[in-house]
């Protein structure tokens, strides 16, 4: 898998829970706003209780509200180890434009889940570097099979789980405006200036080619 440089912040855990958690852009914006407005909501129990009581996710049942609220909070926590920088990144998700929200949400996913980090820096970055804009289902599946051979946690995942993860990875790219699933074509982003600067400040400039940018 992609080797991280000394200043890059690749997470260590491959999270199969992405099959359930998925993109969550609206939920993450809701959580980001709450946490910036009231520091009491840095406590995930208080956060989940408030979301549930006020039906802020507008889910038809209460069953998944707590776990999804915790997942959103975990992703926001993963944005940076520096509190000020984390707040600024959270601000892009909470109050930014639609493009800032989507792009920062993808960055949060990368920082939270080694699966997404490796997919972006191994597969997507390689495609951009080769000017090969076709990303087929089989290529994503091959990437996941490679992980399965290298990581004990991933090795326990069933073929059905891996297939669902393949779909979620493609969906995340599409939701961010980087992929068209029908044609299986990638496209580079016009990465938001503020987000790019925060990524650089965060020591993660090495991931910029995964968004189609030069270092």
PLM regions with names:
Residues 2-103:
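Eukaryotic partner-binding/assembly regions in large regulatory complexes
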Residues 127, 149-156:
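Inter-helical turn/loop segments and adjacent helix faces that build the functional surface
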Residues 136-152:
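DNA-recognition alpha helix
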């Amino acid at each position: 898998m992609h080797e991280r440089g000394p200043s890059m912040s690749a997470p260590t855990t491959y999270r199969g829970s992405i099959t359930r958690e998925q993109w969550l852009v609206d939920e993450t914006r809701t959580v980001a706003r709450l946490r910036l407005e009231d520091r009491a909501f840095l406590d995930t129990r208080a956060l989940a209780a408030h979301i549930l009581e006020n039906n802020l996710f507008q889910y038809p049942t209460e069953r998944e509200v707590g776990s999804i609220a915790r997942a959103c909070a975990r992703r926001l926590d993963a944005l940076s180890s520096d509190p000020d920088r984390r707040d600024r990144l959270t601000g892009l998700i909470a109050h930014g434009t639609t493009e800032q929200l989507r792009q920062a949400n993808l960055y949060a996913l990368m920082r939270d889940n080694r699966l997404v980090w490796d997919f972006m820096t191994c597969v997507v970055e390689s495609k951009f570097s080769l000017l090969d804009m076709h990303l087929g289902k089989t290529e994503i599946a091959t990437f996941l099979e490679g992980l399965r051979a290298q990581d004990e946690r991933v090795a326990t995942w069933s073929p059905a789980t891996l297939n669902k993860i393949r779909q979620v990875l493609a969906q995340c790219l599409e939701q961010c405006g980087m992929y068209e699933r029908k044609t299986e074509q990638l496209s580079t982003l016009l990465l938001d200036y503020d987000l790019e600067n925060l990524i650089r400040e965060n020591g993660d400039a090495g991931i910029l080619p995964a968004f189609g940018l030069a270092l």
